[in-house]
Amino acid sequence: MYQDLIRNELNEAAETLANFLKDDANIHAIQRAAVLLADSFKAGGKVLSCGNGGSHCDAMHFAEELTGRYRENRPGYPAIAISDVSHISCVSNDFGYDYIFSRYVEAVGREGDVLLGISTSGNSGNVIKAIAAAREKGMKVITLTGKDGGKMAGTADIEIRVPHFGYADRIQEIHIKVIHILIQLIEKEMVK
């Protein structure tokens, strides 16, 4: 009944991954991002992560597997997803939704910390403002984007971009793979 649809969806997902893998710059960017994050942790820094909708869930997933665990038991790493509902509702009400992440970065971000900003379009105003706030604090910035990188293109120390111009879910599928690989590489870097 739906077998053709299922095959088409899985084939499109595989094609998106294959296109991402064709560009060696993506592989190098993932490696550089993992080293940057591990170096921050080793120096006493932390990572703040943010995004909207599914990207917000990815930001929380990233932080959870750093503070909790991924595949093996090991010490937790300092990671915070900007996801506190009382903070988000307060800032949305008092300043506007575009400031929900930047106000948090201003409050807890420090030089030597890292911001991971996630946006499938690269055009999320609140993530863009968080990047600006991170820069003001002397933080490093890693972005996970899609399409052509949108307004976030060129704003990060390291951008990992999924060059897919279709639906956002295909970009998110690659983002979660990248997140898992980042965690795996961070774990290896932390025991060096």
UniProtKB/Swiss-Prot annotation:
Q: Name the pathway.
A: Carbohydrate biosynthesis; D-glycero-D-manno-heptose 7-phosphate biosynthesis; D-glycero-alpha-D-manno-heptose 7-phosphate and D-glycero-beta-D-manno-heptose 7-phosphate from sedoheptulose 7-phosphate: step 1/1; Bacterial outer membrane biogenesis; LPS core biosynthesis
Molecular function (Gene Ontology), one example: carbohydrate derivative binding
Q: What is its EC number?
A: 5.3.1.28
Q: Which cofactor does it need?
A: Zn(2+)
The EC class name is isomerase
Where in the sequence is the signal peptide annotated? none
**The protein's assembly and partners:** Homotetramer.
- Where's it found, cell-wise? Cytoplasm
Q: How is the cofactor bound?
A: Binds 1 zinc ion per subunit.
Q: What does the entry give for GO biological process? A: D-glycero-D-manno-heptose 7-phosphate biosynthetic process; lipopolysaccharide core region biosynthetic process
Q: Which organism is it from?
A: Salmonella typhimurium (strain LT2 / SGSC1412 / ATCC 700720)
Upper classification of the source organism reads: Bacteria, Pseudomonadati, Pseudomonadota, Gammaproteobacteria, Enterobacterales
Q: What is this protein called?
A: Phosphoheptose isomerase
Its UniProt miscellaneous note says: The reaction produces a racemic mixture of D-glycero-alpha-D-manno-heptose 7-phosphate and D-glycero-beta-D-manno-heptose 7-phosphate.
Give the top-rank taxon of the lineage listed in the UniProt record for this protein. Bacteria
